[in-house]
Amino acid sequence: MLSRFNIHQPFKRCKFRFFLRSIGNPDTILVESCSSSSCSSPEPSLVRSDYLTKPSDQDQIFPLNKIIARCVRSGDIDGALRVFHGMRAKNTITWNSLLIGISKDPSRMMEAHQLFDEIPEPDTFSYNIMLSCYVRNVNFEKAQSFFDRMPFKDAASWNTMITGYARRGEMEKARELFYSMMEKNEVSWNAMISGYIECGDLEKASHFFKVAPVRGVVAWTAMITGYMKAKKVELAEAMFKDMTVNKNLVTWNAMISGYVENSRPEDGLKLFRAMLEEGIRPNSSGLSSALLGCSELSALQLGRQIHQIVSKSTLCNDVTALTSLISMYCKCGELGDAWKLFEVMKKKDVVAWNAMISGYAQHGNADKALCLFREMIDNKIRPDWITFVAVLLACNHAGLVNIGMAYFESMVRDYKVEPQPDHYTCMVDLLGRAGKLEEALKLIRSMPFRPHAAVFGTLLGACRVHKNVELAEFAAEKLLQLNSQNAAGYVQLANIYASKNRWEDVARVRKRMKESNVVKVPGYSWIEIRNKVHHFRSSDRIHPELDSIHKKLKELEKKMKLAGYKPELEFALHNVEEEQKEKLLLWHSEKLAVAFGCIKLPQGSQIQVFKNLRICGDCHKAIKFISEIEKREIIVRDTTRFHHFKDGSCSCGDYW
């Protein structure tokens, strides 16, 4: 009878909390109607009192337990407490339901402990809730002590402790408990496999996987994740292919993210498409991995398709998914689309702000990046260490030395953010490229932790710009001491020697590189034309339209020289005649890609080229001339930033 009143909207507006305050003893029939209503939160209907009967206290327990559980699920612990304290009769389920909610909040540990002690007849589930609370929120000595004093333990009790130790990396203790456990289940085996994987011990993880009596999807996925983290992609592929159980979304995500993180974004995106064809809907994690792959490849069209998937799904307001889209648009050169998306986001967390600030920094728009940082502070968003990497990067790309130093000092003073290695790398780059090499070296020596390889690599790059051979030799030696397989260190030093025509030293560096079995990462550039990606390497001999590309480049070279272009021969890193050096420079991969864009794209339209290494000085100079000759905007993204070439100048102001 009562439930029919739920169709009347005025009655739905009556709030549940007001109801609890005004009626100390809710009626069972009314509560059951509330529980079955289609309302998003429990709300009573108003009815004539003569329709109601007075139930016993015991009859109220079940429906009120349901309300407590609903409050806990929605995070309304105070509401659950009000219902709890208003109940004249309770059972163990009542106590357990409230304990679940309170125990999840680290700040209410004492309250949870007190509540547990008050349970008249705690059962195994009560003990397991409290054990999980200790494992999550306090030191393991107390958790172990509580576990040892438990009057009865089930598989969940043992698994909680094993999983807790495994997540802390204490695998010996986890192993000891595992072998003390009388009846192990699938969760027990999964905890051991995952624990060894987190510790990087794939051998032991593989052993437990092989001897496990039941291997479910969790175990298979854990092994795939472990192999991907260890860069053993072929083993992960074999595991994925040989799975004897159905793959779930987490399994697909592990493979897709693994491909992208192991520099195989093409395979990751191919698998993402296969997942969609299987009818599996991606979650925010899978979409983020796919969008990262799009960013790596500058696959803008696929990125836009993923944007459509997000817009038509329940993830349309998901902060993680939208932030990944912003990052993708920024890295694909579509800063305008990124900004539009950022503006319409209903909720922005620090990660979203970081993505947009980083986008402006990568494109060399320091004013916008720093303005956005100030707006972020005004919006009471607390910056983190990644925020300051983006801010310092913006200063770096614009050569704002004093402003960068001010922000570096402000990090600790005003925001209590301790400088990380990445912050020091940004500052060394900022000082070094401004010619303040000694100050950069002084900063490295003042670092509160051991300098890392990247900071010496950055100093080495600055030495090349300013042709400081002595400091370059020091930086290179330090770099190679920290990472003897760092190809960039050898190449940078050889390039500095080459710029000084010290060919014997170049030969010595190359010999050392060969003896150390270090292979230089080959430079290449790519451009997307009508949804097809075209790759180019220096002195490319493979592309089917190479003849027309060479013809176009020779035409451009003549026009550039008439306009005042002189090749920067120091970037031709071979001991050959000047004429041969000019030819080598003309066939650099970024020039080949730009020329191909000039041929294939409509006159006056924008050209976007991407390179896997830093753009060379001669190419940077030449593309400025080409942008003026062709009357086009040419955008080149290298490993450090975006260069926007237009009307004979670059957005970086030649500061890169």
Curated annotation (Swiss-Prot):
* A cellular-component GO term for this protein: mitochondrion
Q: Which GO terms describe its biological process?
A: RNA modification
What molecular function terms (GO) are annotated for this protein? RNA binding; zinc ion binding
Q: Origin, by domain of life?
A: Eukaryota
Q: Where in the cell is it found?
A: Mitochondrion
Q: Where is this region: Type DYW motif?
A: 562-656
Q: What start and end residues bound the annotated signal peptide? A: none
SUPFAM superfamilies this protein is in?
A: TPR-like (SSF48452)
Q: Kindly give the Gene3D superfamilies that the UniProt entry links to this protein.
A: Tetratricopeptide repeat domain
Keyword terms of this UniProt record:
Mitochondrion, Repeat, Transit peptide
Extract the Pfam families matched here.
DYW_deaminase (PF14432), E_motif (PF20431), PPR (PF01535), PPR_1 (PF12854), PPR_2 (PF13041)
Where does the transit peptide lie? Answer: 1-71
- Segments of this protein annotated with the region Type E motif: 455-530
Which regions does the record annotate with the repeat PPR? 60-94, 95-122, 123-153, 154-188, 189-215, 216-246, 248-282, 283-317, 318-348, 349-383, 384-414, 420-454
- Annotated region (Type E(+) motif) at 531-561
Checking NCBIfam families in the record gives: PPR
Q: Which family does it belong to?
A: Belongs to the PPR family. PCMP-H subfamily.
Task: Please give the name of this protein.
Answer: Pentatricopeptide repeat-containing protein At4g16835, mitochondrial
Q: Which organism is it from?
A: Arabidopsis thaliana
Specify the taxonomic lineage.
Eukaryota, Viridiplantae, Streptophyta, Embryophyta, Tracheophyta
